Structures are given as C-alpha cells and as structure tokens.
Amino acid sequence: MIELSKSVSKINSSATITMSALANKLKSEGQDIISLSAGEPDFGTPKHIQEAAIKAIKAGKTKYTNPDGMPELKEAISQKFITENDLKYEATQISVGTGGKQILYNALMATLNPDDEVIIPAPYWVSYPDMVKLAGGSPKIVKTASENNYKLRPNDLRASI
C-alpha cells in the first residue's frame, strides 16, 4: 500500500464533504433540505456565461492559460470591481483560479514557513484551519462579534498577535 505524506495526518476529514453527503442523503429520502455545505450555487450558469464559454471553445481557446488567468478576463474582473463594487484594482493585481479555497491555499503555500501562525477570524469556512496546517502553519482562531458585522477589528488583531 502507498504510504501517504505525514502532512496528511495533520488534517481532519472534510466536514464539507460529510455535510454535503448527509444533505444529499436526506434529499434523496424526500426531505426538504437547503444545503449550505459545498458552496454550489442554487441556480444554473447564467446564459451570457454559457454563450461566452461556447464561443471560447469554438474559437479554439481550449489550452492552458497564464497561471494567474487570461489577461482579458482579468481586465473584465477589474472593470466589474470598478462599476459594481467601487473598487480600483489593476488587472495585474488580480489572480484568477478555480475557486476561493484554491487561491487561498496557493497563497498559504507561497507565504508560510513552518509553524508560522495564521490568524483566522471566526466565523470561518471549515477548511481554513486544515489548509493552514497542510501548508505548515499553525491556525489561530480569533472570534468576531455580530455587533461589528463579524469583521476583525484592529484592536482584536493586535490582541491576537
């Protein structure tokens, strides 16, 4: 049998997968379930995205892209941030990935040294502590409060360091 890396023993089994499996089981039994587990949207892919994907495939855009995303997509994201969120980010400041967890994990792997402490504001997504551990870091959970809209305040951050 193949022996797994010692780093795998540092993490727990996925609570997301466990909850998703339970939600699917209960749904299959006819129960009315709203699953907040796997982060899957409860709507289909918007028509304009479907059409853009089909157009890209027909244009032969089926090869690997730049590691941080296609320049035209990064530019579109930059424009979206400006028009919809009143945020100014240059395309060079944007990195596109397959999902939020993947981007966060890449950042952790690129920046953590063994036993670096990573502050995780609570509430948090269940995977974050294990992602930190897998990257060699040590998670430190810092509680946030509803009266602060669950945002980590500067004083809370200072007190946790």
Where are these predicted regions, by residue range?
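N-terminal small-domain helix-loop-helix segment of the aminotransferase-like
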Residues: I2-G99, N106
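Conserved core of the PLP fold type I
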Residues: K61-I161
